[in-house]
Amino acid sequence: MRSIRYWLGGLVLIALTVNLAGCGINDIPRLDEQVKAAWSQVQNQYQRRADLVPNLVATVKGYAKHESDVLISVTQARARVGSLQLPANITENPQAFKKFESAQKNLTGALSRLLVVSENYPQLKADQNFLTLQAQLEGTENRISVARRDYILAVQKYNTELRTIPGRWYASMFYPDAKVKQNFTTAKENFKAPKVSF
């Protein structure tokens, strides 16, 4: 009789384990891993862009020597990006995340000014090395957009799981160290249409 009780108890335990595994208890670690993977892609693409900057600046410098203000701003923005000490938990650290985002926005702005200045130099625009770097930069900016989108979606799913039931319960019982992840902000000026006058 006792062996039947133990056997039934084991079956109930197995059934509970399977039931809990199937009802979302593993969603939090799974979604956390998706956020980490998406964040790695964001970092990879930003690093790819930062690696293009020295060659782009050197190419432009050869043609536009007196545009030193723009060249210096790009070089300084890249240096700020390169000097950031990112904590391992950056996606959970609002101050570090904002610092990273701000440095990347500064580099984006400086690169935009550099490309606008390059329009004034027809010889530069015809240079094959510049054209190649410009195409690589454009492709990298597209990759950054895709990586950021994927990260935003992963964070949205993760944060929603932590804030809704039953995910909130699972987090409090099984994952007490789970924290809401930081997400990118979009400046309101990005939504304004540019004014065109003829």
Predicted regions and their residues:
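A helix-centric hydrophobic-segment signal that preferentially recognizes long
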Residues: 2-198
